[in-house]
């Protein structure tokens, strides 16, 4: 058996692709009978766009934000009022340590310890050879699985972007970070051609 699907390629990465990504994510979730879209959103704009796109579809969002302290010590960048609004609609808003950096980044930045890490090498390989959005989408699924917001047996739609907005849509079978090599990127629905 084979499946033939169209992949959407954006000319360049960036937030101008967010609306298209939201529509494509909902469309592919509906086609596959999936009920969860995992989406990265640092401040809330992308989460808001996706919440509008899934309204009335029965699809649940798992919004994964930057960890507290990512931009500055003790600061959560996400719009707290929007988080409450999304939760009241049945969506999840979670934050967790970046699965593909976290403690490793502290070690590689240290002048005493120094050097790159294997985990950061995996992240950089995703960013450089495929797409930043793919790295983000994979990482968000790992975080969501580790937080218990998604299971590891059912596929999800995963959405990431480059700096702001969304530009990559994937179908992923999740795993926990500790079982990283069990994660499967099963489909690329959309991604930028140029990085």
Show which residues each predicted segment covers.
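Glycine-rich phosphate-binding "P-loop"
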Residues: 1-27
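Long, charge-dense
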Residues: 3-7, 59-119
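Glycine-rich phosphate/diphosphate-binding loops and the adjacent beta-loop-alpha structural elements
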Residues: 9, 118-132
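General beta-strand structural signal in soluble alpha/beta enzymes
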Residues: 18, 38-41, 63, 93-97, ...
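N-terminal active-site beta-alpha-beta segment that forms phosphate/nucleotide-binding
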Residues: 27-79
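Short coil/turn connectors at secondary-structure junctions
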Residues: 32-35, 56-60, 88-91, 150-155, ...
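Internal active-site segments that recognize and position negatively charged phosphoryl groups
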Residues: 36, 126-160
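Glycine-rich, aromatic-bearing surface loops/beta-hairpins
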Residues: 123, 154-195
